[in-house]
């Protein structure tokens, strides 16, 4: 049995190449109806070089039609320059405007601070620059279509420009949340709840079943911890990524310093080589933020800070006395945050505040277990004496937000991604418990590992829409509509041939068929035989040659020693032409047909000639006063008060009321009419 073509298959396949029971290198492959989509293309922050990539070797990049990037974090877009520049991928790539603006600078910083050799680097600054030309942008709620795949995006919260993508293929809808947050903060709106319910929801599970502390309590704890560190004469290190949570923390610290004059002499530094560029982007895209920021921008730009200075590198830093430094990267694998941590970790007055989610295998995750010593990038062992606090400002949903989001959408299938194995398992169990006794809502929860496929079946109805000329009149019950079925991507239309050029790129062409058939018999005999078959033969002259129109579409022209058939090719006309050809060949090859022709099929009898001569003939038989003409097609004969009416076209006789029993009158009139007809149309 042959395999079903991918385009006709009802199987939908979802396979994580990254972020399957892990956090990092998000990359989800979606396959349905012969279309392939990649959702995000990130790197693993705890790994280096090729090891940090998703399992791209399991796919053929040339087969991917569409690549959608949810936001600018490295674990969601860090492998994109490599994928666009170093593979056979030829599809189209989309992200929001803000994501594209920040992607450029964030990955530039990643290239510069990566602590690996040039040979192990996945891509260069040049690759990154060239990848920009291959990335297209999409506005929130703007519907686009690529290769029959419709998609649009919603605000996801999380970071500036973060998007959730709704994808529709052949009527099946899938929502990919990426990283999202349902809690509005100081500058970002909460993630939207789409008004369209998806069939499949691919959702992050970073925090599993944890419940976040309230925003006000978290901010107060953060500010108090920073205050305590500088009060004891220490230096506060807050490792963050250059963009994202950093801007939220800067807004909090700037406001806190403003309200505490005693802190005005203690500097706050935003230490990133991208500091100025990043802030310029944030100052540009305020319209993508929440209402509070949009209103405030009319008075002053909240991202122009009063108490925070930019620090490009350690060369510009006077490390004297207490200070607060926000430095990238967030997990301290390399860069400024790692340098400062190694410099300050041996002094118990100093403190580090981990303010975001930390991936396994990173220094930030390691120090949260409070080890007695750490290993520097040069391999030296140092005692860890500085205080370590974890206050999560990570803008991911907690269990309450996740479960409410699922409850609002009620998708039949939920696919969990972007979560550590145990957290994901706990979330899956909690969601199953929530819906196991609910008879109205049935939700299947899946948590695939990396490279493990989830296969779902969706049997969509095929509906064809009648358009154009065929749709001008409302059809009646039982009416047959005939047209051309046009399939474009996953839409079917029935069109009249004359509408093809209006609704498609197809050109309308006609093929005129001509066929010559040997024929030496009488042409009027052929006319007679075709008339017996069809009941409707029109006699014509074409270029002074006798011709017939049969079935209204087949023309038969007499030529010396043959007849020529002409018709416009289509399935019905071709069938009619085959029938006419069969009749011609039968008449030509069978002499009995000519001998057995009882009907005299000469030239077509002129009706008015026949009528006049029959009238004279009947007057000779019955008397001049007994015969009269009615309506040009009826001859009436009255004898001894009995009347017989002769139909000139059919040569049949009907007797009027009271004359039915006079069979002799009817027979005499009918016989006279038939004899005259045969005399006027002799057999050749």
From Swiss-Prot:
Chain residues that bind Zn(2+) 1: 71, 73, 158, 179
Phosphoserine: residues carrying this PTM: 659
Class of enzymatic activity (EC top level): hydrolase
UniProt cross-link Glycyl lysine isopeptide (Lys-Gly) (interchain with G-Cter in SUMO), position: 462, 465, 545
Binding site for Zn(2+) 2: 75-76, 179, 418
Cited InterPro entries: Beta_Casp, CPSF73-100_C, MBL, Metallo-B-lactamas, RibonucZ/Hydroxyglut_hydro, RMMBL
Phenotypic consequence of residue 465 to R: Reduced sumoylation
Subcellular localization: Nucleus
Effect of residue 73 to A: Inhibits histone 3'-end processing
Result for mutant: residue 75 to A: Inhibits histone 3'-end processing
Keywords from the UniProt entry: Acetylation, Disease variant, Endonuclease, Epilepsy, Hydrolase, Intellectual disability, Isopeptide bond, Metal-binding, mRNA processing, Nuclease, Nucleus, Phosphoprotein, Ribonucleoprotein, RNA-binding, Ubl conjugation, Zinc
Residues where Phosphothreonine is found: 681
Top-level taxon: Eukaryota
Signal peptide boundaries: none
PTM section of the record: Sumoylated on Lys-462, Lys-465 and Lys-545, preferentially by SUMO3.
Cofactor annotation remark: Binds 2 Zn(2+) ions per subunit.
GO molecular-function terms, A-Z: 5'-3' RNA exonuclease activity; metal ion binding; RNA binding; RNA endonuclease activity
Stretches of the chain forming a coiled coil according to its record: none
Protein name: Cleavage and polyadenylation specificity factor subunit 3
